[in-house]
Amino acid sequence: MTKIETRTEPMVLNMGPHHPSMHGVLRLIVTLDGEDVVDCEPVIGYLHRGMEKIAESRTNIMYVPYVSRWDYAAGMFNEAITVNAPEKLADIEVPKRAQYIRVIMLELNRIANHLLWLGPFMADVGAQTPFFYIFREREMIYDLWEAASGMRLINNNYFRVGGVAVDLPYGWNDKCEDFCDYFLPKVDEYEKLITNNPIFRRRVEGVGTVTREEAINWGLSGPMLRGSGVKWDLRKVDHYECYDELDWEVQYETAGDCFARYLVRIREMRESVKIIRQALKAMPGGPYENLEAKRLQEGKKSEWNDFQYQYIAKKVAPTFKIPAGEHYVRLESGKGELGIFIQGNDDVFPWRWKIRSADFNNLQILPHILKGVKVADIMAILGSIDIIMGSVDR
């Protein structure tokens, strides 16, 4: 009896750009041999809006509302880096109280970022329930932001060169403390529900492994880097704001797989609560903005300084000139290193505004770690990277 040899041609499959688990408008051109991935080519750019070019024709005050749209799951980080760049270039000092307020806002944003990563990631690996839980917690963070800045998810427009737009309202600190008391047991609940679930463990352990050397060579940052055994966190490395005055640990894992990245993010949420509690306790009095920086920015006094207009950008006229020179400023966002390269030429507009987003750099390793995996693992690996296409494409 003669055996007939069957040879299958590789199949080319388009995943996205409108698939719910693609985390935005990402398109993957995947070449499959049966169930195995032979090659993968990510196609990006569907959400490109020219954010860097827009910055070159906007003053800093005018540009702050735009930046929430880079990484629209965590807008505060974008605002922080947008004001940090001119601050460092012009050597403007930020008052202590403003630093503490900023740290609290950034850590709330880190928790919100990791929550919005956790829900869709669990949905990607087949667990639907946590997706509904995370919005219950995020809703409380939205309430805190709304009380402080007037806006909930994006366009908080809260950070300013030399400080923040307005001081925290009366009772906000107690409300934030209540959130911390409520949220910590919820993280334990997530752990109980997810971490030792045998189905979840089989889906993520040993999948999408990135070694320590690969993580460094590919320029990864954030939980992608720390999940591969590199103890690198810009809050410790760059000593920005008042993180040095607070007691907290850098969370890292050595396995480098999807499960390690999950553990890093879960533990970072706990550390963020720890940081927020300390910052609330240690927050000093004093001004919430650098009055000298404000004087540089402010136009003539008018009714725009009135209480009901306090959030409107008209309050400060865009007369602040960015000094000649260039500078690279970075901070640790929920996804990794978010940086701005700014070039000023003694004008109200920056001459060059280059955005270095964490998820754009983290996404580039995807084709490398997808080679040889099963097609069902693509979603788990992509989900573990934590990308937002607004930030990737800008």
UniProtKB/Swiss-Prot annotation:
SUPFAM superfamilies: HydB/Nqo4-like
Membrane topology reported for the UniProt record: Peripheral membrane protein
Enzyme class, first EC level, given as a word: translocase
A molecular-function term among this protein's GO annotations: NAD binding
Keywords attached to this entry: Membrane, NAD, NADP, Plastoquinone, Quinone, Thylakoid, Translocase, Transport
Protein function: NDH-1 shuttles electrons from an unknown electron donor, via FMN and iron-sulfur (Fe-S) centers, to quinones in the respiratory and/or the photosynthetic chain. The immediate electron acceptor for the enzyme in this species is believed to be plastoquinone. Couples the redox reaction to proton translocation, and thus conserves the redox energy in a proton gradient. Cyanobacterial NDH-1 also plays a role in inorganic carbon-concentration.
Reaction catalysis annotation: a plastoquinone + NADH + (n+1) H(+)(in) = a plastoquinol + NAD(+) + n H(+)(out); a plastoquinone + NADPH + (n+1) H(+)(in) = a plastoquinol + NADP(+) + n H(+)(out)
Entry's EC annotation: 7.1.1.-
Cell location: Cellular thylakoid membrane
Organism of origin: Synechocystis sp. (strain ATCC 27184 / PCC 6803 / Kazusa)
Homology family: Belongs to the complex I 49 kDa subunit family.
GO cellular component terms listed in the entry, alphabetical order: plasma membrane-derived thylakoid membrane
GO biological process, one term: photosynthesis, light reaction
The keyword Transmembrane is assigned to this record: no
Description of how the protein assembles with itself and partners: NDH-1 can be composed of about 15 different subunits; different subcomplexes with different compositions have been identified which probably have different functions.
Protein name per the record: NAD(P)H-quinone oxidoreductase subunit H
Description of post-translational modifications: The initiator methionine has been seen to be kept and removed.
